Amino acid sequence: MVHYKLSYFPIRGAGEVIRQIFVYAGQSFEDHRISIEEWAAVKPTTPFGQLPLLEVDGKVLPQSHSIARFLARQFGINGKCAWEEAQVNSIADQFKDYRNEVRPYVMVKMGFAEGDLDALSKDVFLPGFKKHYGFIYNFLKTAGSGYLVGDSLTFVDLLIAQHTADILSTDPALLEEFPQFKAHQEKVHSNANIKKWLETRPETQF
């Protein structure tokens, strides 16, 4: 039996979609959570000095979206054809662009940097959120299935549904402009495996 080990910090962050891919597929995995204190010693041993890392029978794969794409293909949630897979990957790449754009706000909010959180919210996060969620919303409306691509769940549905849930828990008014995202989040999180995971996973702020 293949042994999967996911190493990431004890937060949701970039590792959560990977955890949820395993959960959705019903695949057991080792959820290795590395504390900030442990990270200094671990960092030099990683390929790019970053987490998450996936180990598959001892072979190491870095980069969150590379891991997600690999597992999505393994478990059949990467799209039903090459075109759908390309669309799925484009949404994942766009979401990474969004995260990079709002990173200054997120770093201050998480306490990893200093800055004016209110100003960063107004000038960085809100414009970035509306722009990028608007792009992704177009995929949801075009698909017309309740999923982002095609007529079945793909890993980007897990990715976006988790972020939507995070937004709903902190500032639900942001989604008034994108009403179908709430229904999308509810649809994705109604899956029995995912629902159980959300109820039992470790509580983290981010």
Swiss-Prot record:
Catalysed reaction(s) here are:
RX + glutathione = an S-substituted glutathione + a halide anion + H(+)
Q: A Pfam family this protein belongs to?
A: GST_C_3
Residue span(s) of domain GST N-terminal: 2-79
Q: SUPFAM superfamilies, per this entry?
A: GST C-terminal domain-like (SSF47616), Thioredoxin-like (SSF52833)
UniProt keywords, alphabetically:
Transferase
> What Gene Ontology terms for biological process does this UniProt record contain?
glutathione metabolic process
InterPro entries named among the record's database cross-references: Glutathione-S-Trfase_C-like, Glutathione-S-Trfase_C_sf, Glutathione_S-Trfase, Glutathione_S-Trfase_N, GST_C, GST_superfamily, Thioredoxin-like_sf
Residue sites binding glutathione per the record = 8, 39, 43, 49-51, 63-64
UniProt xrefs under CDD domains = GST_C_Sigma_like, GST_N_Sigma_like
Q: Where is the GST C-terminal domain?
A: 81-206
Q: So what family is this one in?
A: Belongs to the GST superfamily. Sigma family.
General function of this protein:
Conjugation of reduced glutathione to a wide number of exogenous and endogenous hydrophobic electrophiles.
Q: Mind telling me what this protein is named?
A: Probable glutathione S-transferase 8
Protein species of origin: Caenorhabditis elegans
